[in-house]
Amino acid sequence: MSGSKREAALTGQPKDERKKSGGGVINRLKARRVQGKESGTSDQSSVTPFREEELLGLNQLRPEHVLGLSRVTENYLCKPEDNIYGIDFTRFKIRDLETGTVLFEISKPCSEQEEEEEESTHLDASAGRFVRYQFTPAFLRLRKVGATVEFTVGDKPVKSFRMIERHYFRDHILKSFDFDFGFCIPNSRNTCEHMYEFPQLSEELIRQMTENPYETRSDSFYFVDNKLIMHNKADYAYNGGH
């Protein structure tokens, strides 16, 4: 799966007004850069290469560090407590933009449910940082896909919120998105939809990705003011229905 363009609509409004309509200003944003071998736009010549082992030894990671990675990470490059801004992703939806069909949707439980779950179970420190997706092979042939994400912000203002998302198949990079959320006000609920336009994948690559579930993986790195504060992971299978 590879991408050639990504756009977003970002809406921010205070949490206590999230049920009201018309409370936020909508900004339409574009990714600063998209890379991907399938799209013919992969140019790493100006990027300094880094190994994961090198980055694990650093106290502070910046965007140029993760852009220099040539393979998916095996470890998390920051701790959950590094998210000092209280950024919390509460809803995620993937849809086919051409038909409007919802392909995947997940929402975080409400506060009351979370409290009950925390009392009854011991949560792993990495809970919520990893997602596993399963799609049918037809997903790899979609041309336009929208990914809607909703997140809340804590008491601190978030300056220059940025996400770098890198997708790999068998440790070969498929695509890399570099996306600016911009400024988020304190105690706000924000929604954005990333609109991906995918070029046509080769039949051989589609076959390999379908026959090898969960060997397609991704790293999502989140930065505030150029400092890494969150790192999420995902893996993907495209053999649904088989």
Swiss-Prot record:
Pfam name, any one: GMP_PDE_delta
Protein keywords: Cilium biogenesis/degradation, Lipid-binding, Protein transport, Transport
Any one biological process term the GO annotation gives: lipoprotein transport
Biased composition (Polar residues): 38-48
GO cellular component: ciliary transition zone; cilium
Annotated GO MF terms: lipid binding
Entry binding sites for tetradecanoate: 133
InterPro entries (UniProt xref): Ig_E-set, PDE6D_unc-119_myristoyl-bd, PDED_dom, PDED_dom_sf
UniProt-listed Gene3D superfamilies: GMP phosphodiesterase, delta subunit (2.70.50.40)
Main function: Myristoyl-binding protein that acts as a cargo adapter: specifically binds the myristoyl moiety of a subset of N-terminally myristoylated proteins and is required for their localization. Plays a key role in localization of proteins to the primary cilium membrane.
Domain notes: Adopts an immunoglobulin-like beta-sandwich fold forming a hydrophobic cavity that captures N-terminally myristoylated target peptides. Phe residues within the hydrophobic beta sandwich are required for myristate binding.
Family according to the record: Belongs to the PDE6D/unc-119 family.
Protein name in UniProt: Protein unc-119 homolog B-A
Taxonomic lineage of the native organism: Eukaryota, Metazoa, Chordata, Craniata, Vertebrata
Protein encoded by which gene: unc119b-a
